[in-house]
Protein backbone atom coordinates (compact mmCIF):
# COMPACT_ATOMS: atom_id res chain seq x y z
CA UNK A 1 0.00 0.00 0.00
CA UNK A 2 1.26 3.51 -0.78
CA UNK A 3 2.54 5.19 2.39
CA UNK A 4 1.63 8.87 2.82
CA UNK A 5 2.46 11.28 5.63
CA UNK A 6 0.52 14.40 6.53
CA UNK A 7 1.92 17.52 8.17
CA UNK A 8 -0.23 20.62 8.55
CA UNK A 9 -0.97 23.76 10.53
CA UNK A 10 -4.70 22.92 10.59
CA UNK A 11 -4.82 22.02 14.30
CA UNK A 12 -6.05 18.73 15.75
CA UNK A 13 -9.48 19.98 16.96
CA UNK A 14 -10.46 21.05 13.44
CA UNK A 15 -12.76 18.87 11.34
CA UNK A 16 -10.52 19.63 8.38
CA UNK A 17 -7.93 17.02 9.41
CA UNK A 18 -10.52 14.28 8.94
CA UNK A 19 -11.82 15.87 5.75
CA UNK A 20 -8.32 15.94 4.25
CA UNK A 21 -7.85 12.23 4.95
CA UNK A 22 -11.28 11.44 3.54
CA UNK A 23 -10.42 13.32 0.35
CA UNK A 24 -7.21 11.31 -0.04
CA UNK A 25 -9.00 8.01 0.56
CA UNK A 26 -11.59 8.91 -2.07
CA UNK A 27 -8.72 9.20 -4.52
CA UNK A 28 -7.29 5.83 -3.52
CA UNK A 29 -8.69 3.68 -0.67
CA UNK A 30 -5.34 1.86 -0.55
CA UNK A 31 -3.50 4.93 0.75
CA UNK A 32 -1.94 4.31 4.16
CA UNK A 33 -1.92 7.72 5.88
CA UNK A 34 0.32 8.56 8.84
CA UNK A 35 0.10 11.85 10.72
CA UNK A 36 3.36 13.63 11.51
CA UNK A 37 1.75 16.70 13.10
CA UNK A 38 -1.24 18.97 12.63
CA UNK A 39 -0.11 21.42 15.32
CA UNK A 40 2.49 23.43 13.43
CA UNK A 41 2.06 27.10 14.46
CA UNK A 42 0.98 29.22 11.49
CA UNK A 43 3.86 30.94 9.69
CA UNK A 44 6.53 29.24 11.84
CA UNK A 45 8.78 27.93 9.08
CA UNK A 46 11.74 26.91 11.31
CA UNK A 47 9.48 24.74 13.47
CA UNK A 48 7.73 23.21 10.47
CA UNK A 49 11.08 22.41 8.87
CA UNK A 50 12.43 20.86 12.08
CA UNK A 51 9.37 18.67 12.64
CA UNK A 52 9.23 17.46 9.02
CA UNK A 53 12.98 16.91 8.70
CA UNK A 54 13.23 14.99 11.97
CA UNK A 55 10.31 12.69 11.16
CA UNK A 56 10.86 12.12 7.45
CA UNK A 57 14.33 10.61 7.81
CA UNK A 58 12.75 7.64 9.64
CA UNK A 59 10.39 6.64 6.83
CA UNK A 60 11.09 3.95 4.24
CA UNK A 61 12.17 4.89 0.74
CA UNK A 62 9.49 6.13 -1.66
CA UNK A 63 7.16 7.46 1.01
CA UNK A 64 4.96 10.37 -0.10
CA UNK A 65 5.12 13.38 2.23
CA UNK A 66 2.19 15.81 1.91
CA UNK A 67 2.91 19.11 3.65
CA UNK A 68 -0.11 21.37 4.15
CA UNK A 69 1.63 24.26 5.90
CA UNK A 70 1.08 27.91 4.93
CA UNK A 71 -0.80 26.88 1.83
CA UNK A 72 -2.22 30.36 1.39
CA UNK A 73 0.64 32.70 2.24
CA UNK A 74 0.09 33.95 -1.29
CA UNK A 75 -2.54 33.08 -3.87
CA UNK A 76 -1.53 29.56 -4.94
CA UNK A 77 -0.78 29.12 -8.63
CA UNK A 78 1.16 25.87 -8.42
CA UNK A 79 2.14 23.07 -6.08
CA UNK A 80 5.63 21.63 -5.91
CA UNK A 81 6.42 17.94 -6.38
CA UNK A 82 9.96 16.95 -5.43
CA UNK A 83 12.02 13.77 -5.20
CA UNK A 84 15.03 13.80 -2.89
CA UNK A 85 16.96 11.05 -1.09
CA UNK A 86 14.39 8.51 -2.29
CA UNK A 87 11.47 10.43 -0.77
CA UNK A 88 8.61 12.28 -2.48
CA UNK A 89 7.43 15.68 -1.28
CA UNK A 90 4.31 17.63 -2.27
CA UNK A 91 3.82 21.10 -0.82
CA UNK A 92 3.00 24.73 -1.50
CA UNK A 93 5.45 26.99 -3.32
CA UNK A 94 6.27 28.97 -0.17
CA UNK A 95 9.96 28.26 0.52
CA UNK A 96 9.41 25.54 3.13
CA UNK A 97 10.67 22.73 0.91
CA UNK A 98 14.27 23.93 0.79
CA UNK A 99 14.20 24.61 4.55
CA UNK A 100 13.20 20.99 5.18
CA UNK A 101 15.79 19.54 2.81
CA UNK A 102 18.52 22.07 3.75
CA UNK A 103 19.40 22.11 0.06
CA UNK A 104 17.74 22.10 -3.35
CA UNK A 105 15.92 18.88 -4.29
CA UNK A 106 17.34 16.41 -6.80
CA UNK A 107 14.17 16.65 -8.90
CA UNK A 108 11.51 19.33 -8.65
CA UNK A 109 8.34 19.68 -10.70
CA UNK A 110 5.77 22.47 -10.81
CA UNK A 111 2.14 21.36 -10.80
CA UNK A 112 -0.07 24.15 -12.23
CA UNK A 113 -3.42 24.62 -10.52
CA UNK A 114 -6.71 25.06 -12.35
CA UNK A 115 -7.24 28.82 -12.57
CA UNK A 116 -11.01 28.39 -12.38
CA UNK A 117 -10.94 26.22 -9.25
CA UNK A 118 -11.67 27.54 -5.77
CA UNK A 119 -8.29 27.29 -4.05
CA UNK A 120 -9.15 25.86 -0.65
CA UNK A 121 -7.50 23.14 1.44
CA UNK A 122 -9.73 20.35 0.15
CA UNK A 123 -9.06 21.29 -3.47
CA UNK A 124 -5.29 21.36 -2.92
CA UNK A 125 -5.50 18.03 -1.10
CA UNK A 126 -7.34 16.51 -4.05
CA UNK A 127 -4.58 17.68 -6.39
CA UNK A 128 -1.95 16.17 -4.08
CA UNK A 129 -3.83 12.87 -3.94
CA UNK A 130 -4.07 12.68 -7.73
CA UNK A 131 -0.34 13.35 -8.02
CA UNK A 132 0.45 10.49 -5.64
CA UNK A 133 -1.93 8.20 -7.53
CA UNK A 134 -0.19 8.96 -10.82
CA UNK A 135 3.18 8.10 -9.30
CA UNK A 136 1.83 4.93 -7.68
CA UNK A 137 0.44 3.84 -11.06
CA UNK A 138 3.88 4.10 -12.62
CA UNK A 139 3.81 7.50 -14.30
CA UNK A 140 7.21 9.18 -14.47
CA UNK A 141 7.58 12.17 -12.16
CA UNK A 142 8.88 14.23 -15.08
CA UNK A 143 5.64 13.68 -17.01
CA UNK A 144 3.34 14.94 -14.26
CA UNK A 145 4.15 18.66 -14.42
CA UNK A 146 6.75 21.13 -15.62
CA UNK A 147 10.44 20.60 -14.81
CA UNK A 148 11.16 24.15 -16.01
CA UNK A 149 9.85 25.62 -12.79
CA UNK A 150 10.65 28.73 -10.82
CA UNK A 151 10.00 28.32 -7.12
CA UNK A 152 10.58 30.17 -3.88
CA UNK A 153 13.65 29.16 -1.87
CA UNK A 154 14.20 29.83 1.82
CA UNK A 155 17.21 28.69 3.81
CA UNK A 156 16.84 26.91 7.11
CA UNK A 157 17.80 28.65 10.33
CA UNK A 158 21.49 27.93 10.90
CA UNK A 159 23.48 28.46 14.10
CA UNK A 160 26.28 31.02 14.06
CA UNK A 161 29.66 29.30 14.39
CA UNK A 162 33.11 30.57 15.26
CA UNK A 163 36.24 29.01 16.76
CA UNK A 164 35.18 29.36 20.37
CA UNK A 165 31.39 29.45 20.37
CA UNK A 166 28.10 28.52 18.75
CA UNK A 167 25.00 30.70 18.90
CA UNK A 168 21.77 28.81 18.29
CA UNK A 169 18.06 29.62 18.22
CA UNK A 170 15.21 27.81 19.93
CA UNK A 171 13.23 26.20 17.12
CA UNK A 172 10.79 23.97 18.99
CA UNK A 173 9.25 23.50 22.42
CA UNK A 174 7.70 20.07 22.87
CA UNK A 175 4.63 19.07 24.87
CA UNK A 176 6.79 18.54 27.98
CA UNK A 177 8.15 22.10 27.63
CA UNK A 178 11.59 20.79 26.69
CA UNK A 179 13.47 23.30 24.55
CA UNK A 180 15.02 22.26 21.21
CA UNK A 181 17.87 24.33 19.75
CA UNK A 182 19.08 24.33 16.14
CA UNK A 183 22.51 22.95 17.09
CA UNK A 184 23.17 19.36 16.03
CA UNK A 185 25.47 16.92 17.77
CA UNK A 186 27.75 16.97 14.72
CA UNK A 187 28.07 20.77 14.79
CA UNK A 188 28.65 20.72 18.54
CA UNK A 189 31.43 18.11 18.43
CA UNK A 190 33.09 19.65 15.37
CA UNK A 191 33.35 23.03 17.10
CA UNK A 192 34.15 21.57 20.51
CA UNK A 193 37.34 19.74 19.47
CA UNK A 194 37.52 17.95 22.81
CA UNK A 195 37.33 21.14 24.88
CA UNK A 196 35.19 21.92 27.88
CA UNK A 197 32.07 24.00 27.31
CA UNK A 198 29.35 26.13 28.86
CA UNK A 199 25.81 26.20 27.49
CA UNK A 200 24.42 29.62 28.44
CA UNK A 201 20.82 30.79 28.14
CA UNK A 202 18.56 33.36 29.78
CA UNK A 203 21.70 35.41 30.52
CA UNK A 204 22.65 33.69 33.78
CA UNK A 205 21.64 30.03 33.36
CA UNK A 206 24.46 27.62 32.52
CA UNK A 207 25.02 23.90 31.87
CA UNK A 208 28.48 22.37 31.40
CA UNK A 209 27.66 18.69 30.87
CA UNK A 210 25.82 16.66 28.22
CA UNK A 211 23.51 14.03 29.70
CA UNK A 212 22.41 10.81 28.06
CA UNK A 213 18.90 10.85 29.55
CA UNK A 214 16.68 12.90 31.85
CA UNK A 215 17.38 10.44 34.67
CA UNK A 216 21.05 11.48 34.76
CA UNK A 217 20.11 14.39 37.04
CA UNK A 218 17.96 14.67 40.15
CA UNK A 219 14.30 15.57 39.83
CA UNK A 220 13.89 19.30 39.23
CA UNK A 221 17.45 19.83 37.96
CA UNK A 222 18.24 21.24 34.52
CA UNK A 223 20.14 19.28 31.90
CA UNK A 224 21.25 19.32 28.29
CA UNK A 225 21.21 16.35 25.94
CA UNK A 226 20.95 15.55 22.25
CA UNK A 227 17.48 14.28 21.39
CA UNK A 228 16.46 11.44 19.09
CA UNK A 229 16.66 13.77 16.09
CA UNK A 230 20.23 14.77 17.01
CA UNK A 231 19.46 18.33 18.18
CA UNK A 232 20.50 20.03 21.42
CA UNK A 233 17.74 19.95 24.02
CA UNK A 234 17.49 21.84 27.30
CA UNK A 235 15.19 20.24 29.84
CA UNK A 236 14.36 19.85 33.51
CA UNK A 237 13.92 16.34 34.87
CA UNK A 238 10.16 16.09 35.51
CA UNK A 239 9.90 19.84 35.08
CA UNK A 240 9.05 22.63 32.66
CA UNK A 241 12.22 24.17 31.19
CA UNK A 242 10.53 26.60 28.82
CA UNK A 243 8.16 27.95 31.44
CA UNK A 244 10.65 28.09 34.31
CA UNK A 245 13.37 29.84 32.33
CA UNK A 246 11.03 32.00 30.24
CA UNK A 247 12.34 30.54 26.98
CA UNK A 248 10.39 30.91 23.76
CA UNK A 249 10.64 29.47 20.28
CA UNK A 250 11.93 31.33 17.25
CA UNK A 251 9.71 33.61 15.21
CA UNK A 252 10.44 36.24 12.60
CA UNK A 253 8.91 38.88 14.87
CA UNK A 254 11.23 37.90 17.71
CA UNK A 255 14.26 37.88 15.43
CA UNK A 256 13.57 41.48 14.46
CA UNK A 257 13.59 42.39 18.15
CA UNK A 258 16.68 40.27 18.92
CA UNK A 259 15.11 39.01 22.13
CA UNK A 260 17.54 37.12 24.36
CA UNK A 261 15.13 34.42 25.52
CA UNK A 262 15.19 32.65 22.15
CA UNK A 263 19.01 32.45 21.94
CA UNK A 264 21.26 29.72 23.37
CA UNK A 265 25.04 30.10 23.29
CA UNK A 266 27.73 27.46 23.72
CA UNK A 267 31.20 28.67 24.75
CA UNK A 268 34.20 26.36 24.36
CA UNK A 269 37.18 26.76 26.65
Residue ranges and their predicted role:
Residues 117-183, 187-193:
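Anionic-ligand-binding alpha/beta catalytic cores of soluble enzymes and soluble regulatory domains
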Residues 252-269:
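Conserved glycine-rich phosphate/nucleotide-binding loop
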Residues 1-76:
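N-terminal glycine-/serine-/threonine-rich phosphate-binding loop
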Amino acid sequence: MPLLTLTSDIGNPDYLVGAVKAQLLQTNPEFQIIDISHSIPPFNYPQAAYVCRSAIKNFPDFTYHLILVNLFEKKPEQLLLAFHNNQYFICADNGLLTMILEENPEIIIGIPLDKAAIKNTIYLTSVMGKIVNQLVNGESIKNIGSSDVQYLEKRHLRPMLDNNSIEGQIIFIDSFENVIVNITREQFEEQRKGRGFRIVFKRDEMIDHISESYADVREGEKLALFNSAGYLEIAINKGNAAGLFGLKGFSEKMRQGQLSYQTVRVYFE
